[in-house]
């Protein structure tokens, strides 16, 4: 394959979920410096739930988004700084502030059937001259054909790249292939596509490779898989795999290996891996960032986190419904009492 893959690192955004948004300024600078030296194309920086995600519902961050972005801007020389915005959490004013702090790429994220709420934010990002990306979360919850319709909306608002986002880590290679084929058949050939995987079924790397085989241009990954649930496609693993395939990625594998093991892994207070709870996320098709919230609720109410996660999947809960985790826990407790 001749084309150069665009490597988009998400350690400093999705990775926030893995440590409940508690990166220090020193942490983000150490990680960003290592990524920059390894020559990734972009480094996404924000609270795990995007600009202004720091809240009672999602969890408060150790710092503000702008403090993290400015800290990364101070040390990065090669990579573009990206950020994430969920309409309804972040506003265009927050986006302007992030731009002023150094962000030049924005991924505007909606649930996979709600692209229409991204119009204002995508149009505003384009007016700022930002690299503007549409990000369709929980892409497993709609059909490939319907996903393509939503992607087309984002394209019409001005997105120059649209992502298939497997937020639940619930898709297999056939699911990914079908969605990229649908997007490629619907979008303008000039519009890029991207893949954001989660590793809950251990398919993060495989799914990303299949996406590229179907014409995907940009791939999200994180050092040591640092991300919600069982994490994202581990960056160093993905790079090693595609290098063996002879694909052009432009990054330094050995620097990534060192950064993953020496800088990122020691920060994990809960191992980012496939285990009983994170496997349940992928099996039940649940939003990966529900993991830590569900574990807290399970401890509080004397339940199993797996039971909470499976019930959330049955109820088809989506990102933004974190408050329902406690409701589900209380319902399970009631059911237990009546059993």
Swiss-Prot record:
Organism field: Paraburkholderia phymatum (strain DSM 17167 / CIP 108236 / LMG 21445 / STM815)
Site positions per UniProt: Transition state stabilizer: 13
Gene Ontology biological process terms from the UniProt entry: catabolic process; L-leucine biosynthetic process
EC number(s) from the headed UniProt entry: 4.1.3.39
NCBIfam families noted in UniProt: 4OH_2_O_val_ald, PRK08195.1
Name listed for the protein in its UniProt record: 4-hydroxy-2-oxovalerate aldolase 2
Binding residues for Mn(2+): 14, 196, 198
Domain Pyruvate carboxyltransferase: 5-257
Classification lineage: Bacteria, Pseudomonadati, Pseudomonadota, Betaproteobacteria, Burkholderiales
Pfam assignment, any one: HMGL-like
Swiss-Prot/TrEMBL catalytic activity: (S)-4-hydroxy-2-oxopentanoate = acetaldehyde + pyruvate
Disulfide bonds: none
Binding site for substrate: 13-14, 167, 196, 287
Record bears the keyword Metal-binding: yes
Recorded family membership: Belongs to the 4-hydroxy-2-oxovalerate aldolase family.
SUPFAM superfamilies recorded: Aldolase, post-HMGL domain-like
Active-site residues (renumbered): 17 (proton acceptor)
């Amino acid at each position: 394959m001749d084309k150069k893959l665009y490597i988009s690192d998400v350690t400093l955004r999705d990775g926030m979920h893995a440590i409940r948004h508690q990166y220090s300024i020193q942490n983000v600078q150490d990680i960003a410096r290592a990524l920059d030296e390894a020559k990734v194309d972009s480094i996404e920086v924000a609270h795990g739930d995007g600009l202004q995600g720091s809240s009672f519902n999602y969890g408060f961050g150790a710092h503000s988004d702008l403090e993290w972005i400015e800290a990364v801007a101070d040390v990065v020389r090669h990579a573009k700084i990206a950020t994430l915005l969920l309409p309804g959490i972040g506003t265009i004013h927050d986006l302007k502030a992030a731009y002023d702090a150094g962000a030049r790429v924005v991924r505007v994220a909606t649930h996979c059937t709600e692209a229409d709420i991204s119009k204002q934010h995508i149009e505003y990002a384009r007016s700022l001259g930002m690299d503007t990306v549409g990000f369709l979360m929980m892409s497993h919850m709609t059909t490939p054909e319907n996903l393509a319709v939503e992607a087309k909306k984002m394209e019409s608002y001005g997105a120059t790249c649209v992502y298939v986002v497997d937020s639940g880590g619930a898709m297999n290679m056939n699911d990914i292939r079908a969605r990229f084929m649908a997007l490629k058949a619907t979008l303008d050939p000039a519009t890029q596509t991207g893949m954001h995987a989660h590793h809950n079924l251990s398919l993060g790397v495989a799914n990303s490779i299949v996406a590229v085989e179907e014409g995907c241009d940009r791939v999200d990954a994180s050092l040591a898989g640092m991300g919600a649930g069982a994490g994202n496609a581990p960056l160093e693993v993905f790079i090693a795999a595609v290098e063996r395939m002879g694909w052009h990625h432009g990054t330094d594998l050995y620097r990534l290996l060192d950064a993953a093991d020496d800088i990122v892994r020691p920060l994990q207070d809960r191992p980012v891996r496939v285990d009983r709870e994170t496997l349940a996320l992928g099996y039940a098709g649940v939003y990966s960032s529900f993991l830590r919230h569900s574990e807290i609720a399970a401890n509080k109410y004397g339940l199993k986190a797996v039971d909470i996660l499976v019930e959330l999947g049955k109820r088809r809960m989506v990102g933004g419904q974190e408050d329902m985790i406690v409701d589900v826990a209380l319902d399970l407790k009631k059911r237990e009492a009546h059993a």
